[in-house]
From Swiss-Prot:
Protein name: Glyoxalase domain-containing protein 5
Transmembrane segments: none
Record-linked PROSITE patterns: VOC
Organism lineage: Eukaryota, Metazoa, Chordata, Craniata, Vertebrata
Domain VOC: 25-145
Disulfide bridge positions per record: none
Superkingdom assignment: Eukaryota
Source organism of the structure: Canis lupus familiaris (Dog)
Family: Belongs to the glyoxalase I family.
Length: 148
């Protein structure tokens, strides 16, 4: 599969480039949080994510074909990021729910909106986005793709 393109050669010094990406999709992201309980409550109540338990008592938030694995600060699992800290995540989530409904839902749940709706550029084209923060102060962007 690798075709020997990087054999015994530092990737930093390599002039080789691939003709296509080797990665097909994102599977999961690990979030380091202050409180698993507060995080699971927020994401399940506010965004409707499913809380799942795996490998003993580890927790994840599932949505679509993705998940957010949760590590509590100071109790991370190995291997882990070099500097795992709560509040360092900035992610964009796509919803089919109209943003105006999301805005009303967030207001009803007393989640302050930091910005939006505002136009942005998503991975597949123009999006309309709103921004708010979770209990760890991670920046959460929820967006609708703008029909072309």
């Amino acid at each position: 599969m690798w075709g020997g393109t990087c054999q015994k050669q530092s990737w930093r010094n390599s002039s080789q480039t691939l003709s296509s990406c080797l990665i097909s999709r994102l599977d999961h992201i690990v979030m380091t949080v202050k409180s698993i309980k507060d995080t699971t409550m927020f994401y399940s109540k506010i965004l409707g994510m499913e809380v799942t338990t795996f490998k003993g008592n580890r927790k994840a938030l599932c949505f679509g074909d993705q998940k957010l694995n949760l590590h509590e600060v100071g109790k991370e699992f190995e291997p882990k990021a070099a500097h795992p800290v709560p509040g360092s995540l900035d992610i964009c989530l796509i919803t089919e729910v109209p943003l105006e409904e999301m805005v009303q839902h967030l207001k009803a749940c007393e989640v302050p909106i930091e910005e939006g709706p505002v136009p942005r550029t998503g991975a597949k084209g123009p999006i309309m986005s709103i921004y708010f923060r979770d209990p760890d102060r991670n920046l959460i962007e929820v967006s609708n793709y703008i029909p072309s």
